[in-house]
Amino acid sequence: MSAKGSFTLGMLSIIAAIGLFTAANGFAADAHTTTKFEGVKANSGTATHGRQGNNDTLTWSEDFKIPDTPAPHWQVVDTKGNVFLLQRLKIKGDKENRTITIPSYVHDVAKVQIYCSWAEALLGEASFAKPIVTASGERMHSDSMAMSR
């Protein structure tokens, strides 16, 4: 192979590698993971934010253990300090709400908490490095930008 052919092949390889790296980072940008849960009863695992279309989801990690309390629930806190009580972790028939959809009225998420609604006690919480803006939060922001023009 000539020097020119080797150079062209090398450049194509570099361009392909950059393209793969950029694509991989684009997919990873949709997934955000919290710190480890810490609290009185919830001390393991993390939660991961994902987006499927216009729906934002939270999923707990494989190493998360559901606290042994009567009614543990998902709960999120937004950047303004508003707290939203969401689904139970355990449901009928030993099923689990491992992944939940964040309601559209929640516009951002700063913390994910595990809350016992029976005892009205916080069992543990985990934070995102940066607050997550949900799809509804993005729409609300873009609508307010359009109205200000």
Report each predicted region and the residues it spans.
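Beta-strand signatures of extracellular beta-sandwich domains
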Residues: 73-77
